[in-house]
Amino acid sequence: VHLTPEEKTAVTTLWGKVNVDEVGGEALGRLLVVYPWTQRFFDSFGDLSSPDAVMGNPKVKAHGKKVLGAFSDGLNHLDNLKGTFAQLSELHCDKLHVDPENFKLLGNVLVCVLAHHFGKEFTPQVQAAYQKVVAGVANALAHKYH
């Protein structure tokens, strides 16, 4: 991902304020609610029968935290996202058979959740930088599919 120095600063400054537990669970939960077909990858998570069930599900929250942990790692390696996400790409492609389009959906949901959490601080410039990052991460996660 090519970010200007200003974009890198915007991304890392905001990310330093993110509550990974809260935002991760909310982002994954929203993905599962807004795009219900993604729930098929989470059969072992128990009750996903309603938006309230999804958003309150401890397994969704725990996995969301894990997802954002990996995203955080990516932010530390923006110049090598494909290398950083190589193992996760392989896992999601070969073992889990996740449609790579879902990575884009989750990235866009994450941007919405960040905008909700940070309000006016999530300026159009910050959003543009995050859109670049989530697109780069989605591309890196889809790399094994190519």
Curated annotation (Swiss-Prot):
Q: Which residues carry this modification: N-acetylvaline?
A: 1
Coiled-coil region: none
* Superkingdom of origin organism: Eukaryota
Provide GO CC annotations from the record.
blood microparticle; haptoglobin-hemoglobin complex; hemoglobin complex
Which tissues show it? Red blood cells.
The biological processes this protein is annotated with in GO are: hydrogen peroxide catabolic process
Which UniProt keyword terms apply here?
A: Acetylation, Heme, Iron, Metal-binding, Oxygen transport, Phosphoprotein, S-nitrosylation, Transport
Q: Does the keyword Heme apply?
A: yes
Query: In this protein, which residues make up the domain named Globin?
Result: 2-146
Query: Which parts of the sequence bind heme b?
Result: 63, 92
Q: Phosphothreonine modification sites? A: 12
Q: Which PROSITE patterns match?
A: GLOBIN
* GO molecular function term, any single one: organic acid binding
Q: Which residues carry this modification: S-nitrosocysteine?
A: 93
Residues the record lists as N6-acetyllysine modifications: 59, 82, 144
Q: Which residues carry this modification: Phosphoserine?
A: 44
Q: What is this protein for, i.e. what is its function?
A: Involved in oxygen transport from the lung to the various peripheral tissues.
| Quaternary context | Heterotetramer of two alpha chains and two beta chains.
Family, per entry: Belongs to the globin family.
State the name under which the record lists this protein. Answer: Hemoglobin subunit beta
Source organism (scientific name): Mandrillus sphinx
Record lineage: Eukaryota, Metazoa, Chordata, Craniata, Vertebrata
Gene it is expressed from: HBB
